[in-house]
Curated annotation (Swiss-Prot):
Residues 176-200 are annotated as: Disordered. It holds the Pfam family TB2_DP1_HVA22. It comes from the Eukaryota. This is HVA22-like protein k. Belongs to the DP1 family.
Length: 200
């Protein structure tokens, strides 16, 4: 294995025999729960590719950048299909095992599953329906612009509230730091108010 994949230890491990053996044991272990497999699917499907994409962008290697774009096109298509089918097929035994194996297959440098899916499924489909997809995307974008323009007041209000919340958090942070360091806390309005209440 050469090139970019060998520079990332986790990608190099995907093609090694040790990882294959451990992976198969995890995949077919009856003790593995869906929570473990969901976490593994998220790590393999998103976490590792995010880092690989970062490395491809930082290195400036156009071949690696194209490889990651193809991966994200394949993963995005899979996620789109999964949104509509997950509730039905997740009940099948070993669903998350198969999903995990599929996500590993998409990234294996030796087989380049994402490239196979892109070249054999995604690209031909999008080339055939490009005009309709462009119309749909333009329509959705136009509607989004209308919604944003018609709700400018609400958007400004939400932005102001977020800024106010973040501002109050930033103001409280130094006082909390003083308390944590054992510094004396200066008298606040609530202390003086409690004193005036005792006088009554």
């Amino acid at each position: 294995m050469s090139g970019f994949a060998s520079q990332i230890p986790s990608m190099a491990l995907l093609g090694s025999g040790l990882t294959g053996e451990v992976g198969l044991r995890v995949l077919f272990s009856p003790l593995s729960s869906n929570i473990v497999l969901r976490t593994a699917c998220c790590s393999i499907g998103i976490g590792l590719p995010v880092y690989s994409t970062f490395k491809a962008i930082e290195s400036g290697d156009e071949n690696e950048q194209q490889k990651m774009l193809i991966y994200w096109a394949a993963y995005g298509s899979f996620s789109l299909v999964e949104v509509f089918t997950d509730k039905i097929i997740s009940w099948f035994p070993l669903y998350y095992h198969v999903k995990f194996a599929f996500l590993v297959w998409l990234q294996l440098p030796t087989v380049e599953g994402s490239k196979q899916i892109y070249n054999n499924q995604i690209r031909p489909f999008l080339l055939r329906h490009q005009a309709r997809v462009d119309q749909l995307v333009d329509g959705v974008y136009g509607e989004m612009v209308k919604v944003v323009r018609s709700h400018q007041g609400e958007i400004r209000f939400v932005r102001a509230m977020i800024a106010k919340i973040l501002g109050s958090v930033n103001e409280d942070a130094p006082r909390l730091g003083e308390i944590a360091n054992g510094s004396p806390v200066s008298e606040t309005n609530s202390d003086s108010e409690s004193d005036s209440n005792h006088e009554d």
